[in-house]
Structures are given as C-alpha cells and as structure tokens.
Amino acid sequence: MTERKVKLDRANKSILLRALGDVYYGQRANGGSTEVTGRLILRVNDLPAGGKLTMSAAEYRLAKAALNQLRTQRLAEGGYTDAVDDALARLLRAHTPLLLW
C-alpha cells in the first residue's frame, strides 16, 4: 500500500476539512457509508497547523476528489478558487515516503 505525506498549514487544513465535510454530508444524505470519510476528517482535524498528514492511497483519492468537487462548485458559483487551488496543488505534490532497505 502506498502512502503519501502532505504538510498542511492552517488555511489548507481548513479548506480540506470544508471539502471533506461536503462529501461526508453528501454521502450521509444518500445513505452511503461515511466511515472512511469520517475517519479522515477526524485525522485532519486532530492535526496541528503545519503538521504532516500521512494518507493511504484511498484517502488520497478521496481528498483529491473532494477538493476537485469544491473547486468545481466554487467555479459554478462564480467565486474565488485560490485557496482550493493552493490546497489541491499541495496535495498533488504530496510525496511517498522514501523507504531505505
């Protein structure tokens, strides 16, 4: 399983929580499983500002999709996407930890 580490400052953490919250409430309204999304929200919320978040491949895909969804929503509303773009760029630059054997 590949993991990715991303450093989140206060603004990126807030935007990621907003995006994941929208996905969580959408899943809940549709009667879907919210377990994975809920756990990721709690992990991001417990992270100190400037801390590094380690995500599995599934969590990475979920966070990326959530940020893309929030960006699309803001574009449709005619709002600014600067903060979402920054959080998405930081997430996309997340690296896999180097394992030395």
Q: Can you annotate each of these PLM segments?
A:
Residues M1-W101:
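Positively charged, low-complexity terminal tracts
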